[in-house]
Each structure stands twice: as structure tokens, then as C-alpha cells.
Regions:
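Beta-sheet-dominated scaffold domains
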Residues: 1-166
Length: 166
């Protein structure tokens, strides 16, 4: 079990053979900042979480390597540091398609009336999703790509991955 605080990651362990309320121990395994507004997601052997980076969002790929006793979080947005704005609210994971989607809120939208087919939607972050595609070959990541999908006259209010609505 991997747990997040604003500044660290912890793994649940036990001081005994089984985990009980008296034997449970939280071990700090890394000290990456974490944006508490965005829930981390698991994707296979990895966990993805976001960080605030100046006026943008960074995404980290957390992994644990039992062979080397390493716990690390690689910045998968290091090559696209200004791509994702700082108002991300959700990361969706799809292990079938080997992809993540980051959704951002529409802080500039002040419309309070329900949207209709005739309502003009301004070009804000709510009509955009940021997709991260990756490919592993025999346990080694061999290809990654970020893309930005802007959908005209649409306001993205959530997403569904593997029957889970966000």
C-alpha cells in the first residue's frame, strides 16, 4: 500500500508477520512533493502523481524496484515542462492502451447556467486533455509521447477508464 502526503510517500509494512493495528508501520520511502488536489493513480507496477511546477503541472511515475531496494519517481513531463497548466484535477490511467490522461479545470469559465447545444464554449482548459502514451518492451520503457487534444465547443467534465467514472 502506497500512501501520499503533501511532501512524502509512505509504504505500509508490519513489525510482525501480519499487519495488525499494533504492528502496522508507515515507512517513508521517498520525499517528492504531491499536489493533493489530484488523486494519484496506479497503472500496472507504477503509480502516477502530480506536482505543481511554477505555473504548470508536473507528472511523476513512481516505482519500487525490489532488486535494488529503490523507490523513485521519474518526472515524465521533464521534456514538456510547460505543456500542462497548473489547474489539473484528475489523472486517468488505461493499462490496456498504455496511456494516461490529465484533465484540467476550467477556472476561467464563469457560466452558471446549464450548457446547451447553442452555448458558445470559450477556449479554456476544460476543452483540453493531455495524453501520455508509453510503451514497454520486456520491462523496459522504449517509447513515450505527450500530446494535447483540444476539442472545439466541448467542455470535458470527467472521464471513464475501465468502468470507473471520474
Amino acid at each position: 500500500l502506497l500512501l501520499f502526503s503533501d511532501t512524502s510517500q509512505y509504504k505500509l509494512a508490519s513489525a510482525a508477520e501480519t499487519i495488525t493495528p499494533t504492528s502496522a508501520v508507515l515507512n517513508e520511502v521517498s520525499t517528492f512533493s504531491h499536489n493533493a488536489n489530484v488523486t494519484p493513480v496506479s497503472s500496472g507496477r507504477y503509480a502516477y502523481f502530480s506536482q505543481v511546477r511554477n505555473a504548470n503541472t508536473a507528472v511523476r511515475e513512481y516505482y519500487s524496484d525490489n532488486d535494488t531496494l529503490t523507490n523513485d519517481g521519474l518526472d515524465v513531463t521533464v521534456a514538456v515542462q510547460t505543456l500542462i497548466p497548473d489547474n489539473a484535477y484528475s489523472i486517468l490511467s488505461n493499462t490496456t492502451e498504455d496511456s494516461l490522461i490529465v484533465l484540467c479545470s476550467d477556472t476561467a469559465d464563469t457560466q452558471t447556467a446549464p450548457y446547451t447545444t447553442g452555448t458558445a464554449v470559450s477556449p479554456t482548459n476544460a476543452n483540453t486533455m493531455y495524453m501520455y502514451k508509453y510503451f514497454f518492451d520486456r520491462g523496459e520503457k522504449v517509447q513515450t509521447a505527450w500530446s494535447k487534444w483540444q476539442l472545439d465547443n466541448v467542455k470535458i467534465i470527467g472521464g471513464m477508464i475501465d468502468r470507473s467514472f471520474v
